[in-house]
Regions:
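Short, Lys/Arg-rich flexible segments
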Residues: 1-86, 95, 102-158
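Acidic, low-complexity protein-protein interaction segments
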Residues: 91, 96-97
Length: 158
């Protein structure tokens, strides 16, 4: 939601900006525990949906704070307030038994790849994307509920 404040009354603009900032902080605080539970559910489904050979890829699935994520997972170009500051990733910078970084292996399993013979294609199993899709509506409901709760407090105060 965008809001343009263009008024010259006696402190009204400052009061509104302060209240909007307070609402934003309250929504973020309200979301903290709910999102932690939501991420755990996504993680559990990603692990359950991950194809298992040795189990190394499955055991590498984890939730990380977005600010500490590997560079290729950094989100840029977005404006606005960050409400979800975590991401779910699989793989690591460690090498697997073939000397290939696990991150590349995770991408190949998740997104698919051409087999070594060059004649067949492994279609991939998007276990991370599917786990997020399973819980997408739930996330939308969590965000809407937290926003509605905070805005109802504001209307009660007025």
């Amino acid at each position: 939601m965008s809001m343009v404040l263009d008024e010259t009354d006696f402190g009204g603009k400052v009061k509104i900006k302060k209240k909007v900032s307070e609402i934003d902080d309250n929504i973020k605080e309200s979301l903290k525990d709910r999102l932690e539970i939501w991420w755990r559910e996504v993680l559990n489904d990603a692990i359950a949906l991950c194809p298992v050979d040795s189990g190394a890829l499955q055991s590498s699935i984890r939730i990380v704070d977005a600010s500490y994520a590997p560079e290729q997972f950094q989100v840029t170009g977005e404006t606005g307030n960050v409400l979800v500051d975590s991401i779910i990733i699989a793989g690591s910078s460690a090498l697997n038994n073939d000397g290939v970084p696990c991150m590349q292996y995770a991408l190949a399993v998740h997104d698919g790849h051409v087999m070594r013979d060059g004649k067949s294609i492994y279609m991939g199993v998007p276990f991370l994307a599917n786990a997020l899709l399973i819980h997408e509506a739930e996330l939308e409901a969590i965000l809407a509920d937290a926003t509605d709760e905070e805005l109802s407090k504001v209307t009660e105060e007025s």
